[in-house]
């Protein structure tokens, strides 16, 4: 949720500026941090000398700079995230803050953070993916300098993917008057929604840190998307000394506009606390009016409209940027997915950055908000004797922080927890504990636990939650048979494996086949033994329309989990750990957001109103002249005719009744004798020509091309431009086999934030100024400075014409 009077300052020593009303001041603590990796028992003391420490900005991931450990664990990215780290920052708290309540709010610290103010422990937290806050009023010294120190320790954190390390999400300092709205203190619901009206119920937790009882007026005002006032009310409540009380307000909203995918209308509530007729606090909360129901036989309805979930799972890293949260990087990920036809996100497998939910609210994406992977060290549970306490405080922060987001339609309390699914005693008790706390803090949404052990349904763990969520291979079928009165979602679908731009022959007859290439063919026919290709999930949803939809594993490639080329695979094949990859092959797009072929398969099915005609593979196969090179076409059309050098190779049509899923959703010419030249496909839909697409045999690369996703970015020190690097032939065609070494230079008001080529086998530094093209492409990420002007990025390589692009920093 957004807090009022948002203020960002970027000096090494942060100065706070109060508003004239002296209400609520929210400051992002992003700059002026000192960092040192390792253990240091004195680092929390104010007089400790940190002059030799690294100056960093927060959010910060200390491990993403590497170096890669070739003998390390590919499952967590082969990066040095295990260890200890210290952060220190000087805060100058103005004298005017005397008498105020001061909080520190951390969106996420990996892991087991300890927070110190002026040498004293302010508090601890454990779960690295969850947000937490501390009241530091008694520890700070208004009118002077204060030392904030944060210790992070990832040694006892366990992970199946790259988690990052350090203060990887936003930190805020919040100064409020003694009477104020609590952190995450509003809860907005719409219990009655009709075409002409909606009842908006606003619960507000108001805190009084004075030593005497206070009577205050709580005023609620609703504003529409244009900023016009559309409703208000107020009530008087008494709050005991050093206590809190709840205000319950109801406003009738006339002719409400609904929030839904495709039309995500947001309202906002401004909550004002008045003491003696003076406003002492203001707090703003966006919300949406929407009615969501999920039925066992007909799936999901939003505002009485059937919506098939076309979702993706997203891990929290941003490739070359690591785990450090960046708003633009997140926004770009969602834009790429939404353009494909995606309408939903699952936050696998942890509570997300709050900005992700803000973006989903604004963009109209539905969300399964998931809090844990397992109930063990992956959730930073190192001692289960206090499980009730752990569950209570973590579920409280998770749900209370997120419950006003209209995008969230389902709470998930965990993923693939075998010890819970198969343990009717201890495991089921843990599950019931988690669900109990979710339902206490939000009774308006349904709950689930994501399952993978099909036979465990016989123990009926689904009796405790609301929706069947199962991963892979129609494993939902038994649970559906045993309990048909609950809706079904495929919470992880596909897990198709591929490497962008890479193809192998012949086509595999075994989906799990691996080769010495350490890559996976982009014909989209590979998957792990437990999973399936995309077409299978499309078919199951067509044949079983009660299934509410799917969440593909995954939207983006991510660091870690490099199935199939893991350390275990290397060992089984008598190879060293050095051959294990650093990042996944699961993504619909690569680690940089460059689409794989599979992107267009999903787009053709999920976004059928937009023309898609995509040919694969590329047509540069000099070693295969006269040999077979199968050609696939992904299109939203029904049929297509393929031509090679002007000669028709026949017309193919999809077969919607086929038991072979690929015949329903792809057009395949499996016997094409390769000759260089031009491959053209003409697609048809309902008998009418839809369009055509051409792939040519390219010449040798002669020039580079730089293509920024945006040429104008904000001069805020955070905004990003993702600049695609490509090698072209003399006719301007992208050379699909180019692997030139590229040198990047940058001048002007920007810095190089990251660089990568999407190759899971690349161990080049993400912070280098050199990159090798991977099948003709790579990506450099440029971050703006805080000063307006321009920045010019240039790319050079031996033997090719260089390229440059100028960005406006505004």
Could you describe each region identified by the protein language model?
Residues 37, 55-70, 120, 125, ...:
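Extended substrate-binding grooves/exosites of carbohydrate-active enzymes
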Residues 202-206, 272, 631-635, 682-683, ...:
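Beta-strand-rich structural segments
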Residues 27-29, 36-39, 82-187, 209-210, ...:
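Accessory beta-strand-rich segments of carbohydrate-active enzymes
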Residues 23-40, 51-94, 107, 145-214, ...:
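Non-catalytic, glycine-rich low-complexity segments
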Residues 141, 203-295, 669, 675-676, ...:
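Extended acidic/polar, glycine-enriched regions
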Residues 136-138, 249-258, 667-674, 767-786:
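Short, hydrophobic beta-strand segments
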Residues 1-24:
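Bacterial Sec-dependent N-terminal signal peptides
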Residues 46-49, 214-219, 232, 262-268, ...:
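Short flexible loop/turn segments that cap and initiate beta-strands
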């Amino acid at each position: 949720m957004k807090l009022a009077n948002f203020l960002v300052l970027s000096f090494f020593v942060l100065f706070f500026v109060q508003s004239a009303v002296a209400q609520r001041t929210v400051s992002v603590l992003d700059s002026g941090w000192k960092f040192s990796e390792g253990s240091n028992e004195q680092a929390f003391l104010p007089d400790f000398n940190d002059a030799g420490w690294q100056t960093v900005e927060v959010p910060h991931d200390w491990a993403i700079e590497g170096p890669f450990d070739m003998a390390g664990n590919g499952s967590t990215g082969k990066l040095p995230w295990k260890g200890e780290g210290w952060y220190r920052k000087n805060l100058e708290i103005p004298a005017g803050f005397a008498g105020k309540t001061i909080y520190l709010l951390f969106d996420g610290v990996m892991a087991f953070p300890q927070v110190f103010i002026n040498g004293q422990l302010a508090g601890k937290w454990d779960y690295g993916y969850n947000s937490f806050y501390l009241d530091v009023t008694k520890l700070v010294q208004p009118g002077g300098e204060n030392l904030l120190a944060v210790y992070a320790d990832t040694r006892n954190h366990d992970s199946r993917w790259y988690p990052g390390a350090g203060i990887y999400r936003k930190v805020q300092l919040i100064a409020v008057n003694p009477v104020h709205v609590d952190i995450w203190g509003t809860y907005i619901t719409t219990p009655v929604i009709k075409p002409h009206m909606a009842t908006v119920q606003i619960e507000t937790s108001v805190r009084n840190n004075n030593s005497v009882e206070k009577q205050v007026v709580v005023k609620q005002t609703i504003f529409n998307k244009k900023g016009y006032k559309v409703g208000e009310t107020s009530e008087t409540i008494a709050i005991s000394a050093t206590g809190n009380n709840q205000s319950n307000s109801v406003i009738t909203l006339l002719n409400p506009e609904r929030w839904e995918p495709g039309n995500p209308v947001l309202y906002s509530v401004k909550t004002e606390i008045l003491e003696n007729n003076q406003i002492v606090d203001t707090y703003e909360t966006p919300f949406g009016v929407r009615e969501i129901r999920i039925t066992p036989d007909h799936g999901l309805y939003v505002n009485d409209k059937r919506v098939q979930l076309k979702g993706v799972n997203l891990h929290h890293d941003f490739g070359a940027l690591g785990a450090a949260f960046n708003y633009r990087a997140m926004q770009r990920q969602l834009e790429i997915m939404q353009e494909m036809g995606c309408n939903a996100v699952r936050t696998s497998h942890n509570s997300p950055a709050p900005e992700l939910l803000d973006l989903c609210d604004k963009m109209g994406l539905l969300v399964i908000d998931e809090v844990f992977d397992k109930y063990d060290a992956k959730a930073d549970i190192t001692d289960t004797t206090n499980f009730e306490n752990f569950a209570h405080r973590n579920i409280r922060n998770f749900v209370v922080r997120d419950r006003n987001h209209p995008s969230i339609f389902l709470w998930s309390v965990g993923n693939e927890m075998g010890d819970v699914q198969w343990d009717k005693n201890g495991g089921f008790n843990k599950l019931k504990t988690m669900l109990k706390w979710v339902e206490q803090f939000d009774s308006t949404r349904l709950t689930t636990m994501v399952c993978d052990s099909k036979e465990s349904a016989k123990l009926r763990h689904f009796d405790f939650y609301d929706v069947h969520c199962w991963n892979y291979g129609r494993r939902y079928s038994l649970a559906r048979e045993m309990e048909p009165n609950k809706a079904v979602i495929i919470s992880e679908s596909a897990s198709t494996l591929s490497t962008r731009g890479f193809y192998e022959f012949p086509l595999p007859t075994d989906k799990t086949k691996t080769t010495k290439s350490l890559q996976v063919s982009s014909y989209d026919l590979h998957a792990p033994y437990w999973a399936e290709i995309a077409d299978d999930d499309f078919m199951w949803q067509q044949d079983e329309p009660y299934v509410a939809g799917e969440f593909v594993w995954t939207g983006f490639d991510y660091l870690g989990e490099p199935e199939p080329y893991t350390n275990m695979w290397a060992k089984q094949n008598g190879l060293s750990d050095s051959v294990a990859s650093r990042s996944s092959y699961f993504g619909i797009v690569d680690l940089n957001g460059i689409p794989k072929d599979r992107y267009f398969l999903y787009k053709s099915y999920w976004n059928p109103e937009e023309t898609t005609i995509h040919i694969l593979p590329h047509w540069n196969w000099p070693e295969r002249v006269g040999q077979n090179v199968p050609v696939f076409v992904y299109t939203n059309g029904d049929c297509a005719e393929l031509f090679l050098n002007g000669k028709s190779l026949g017309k193919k049509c999809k077969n919607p009744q086929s038991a072979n899923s690929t015949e329903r959703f792809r057009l395949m010419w499996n016997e094409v004798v390769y000759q260089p030249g031009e491959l053209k496909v003409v697609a048809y839909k309902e008998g009418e020509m839809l369009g055509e697409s051409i792939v040519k045999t390219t010449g040798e690369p002669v020039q580079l091309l730089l293509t920024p996703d945006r040429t104008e970015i904000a001069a805020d020190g955070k905004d990003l431009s993702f600049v695609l690097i490509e090698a072209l032939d003399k006719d301007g065609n992208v050379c699909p086999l180019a692997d030139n070494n590229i040198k990047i230079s940058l001048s002007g008001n920007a810095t190089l934030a990251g660089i990568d080529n999407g190759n899971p086998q690349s161990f080049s530094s993400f912070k280098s100024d050199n990159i090798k093209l991977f099948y003709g492409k790579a990506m450099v990420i440029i971050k703006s400075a805080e000063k307006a002007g321009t920045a010019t990025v240039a790319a050079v390589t031996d033997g090719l014409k260089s390229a440059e692009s100028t960005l406006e920093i505004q």
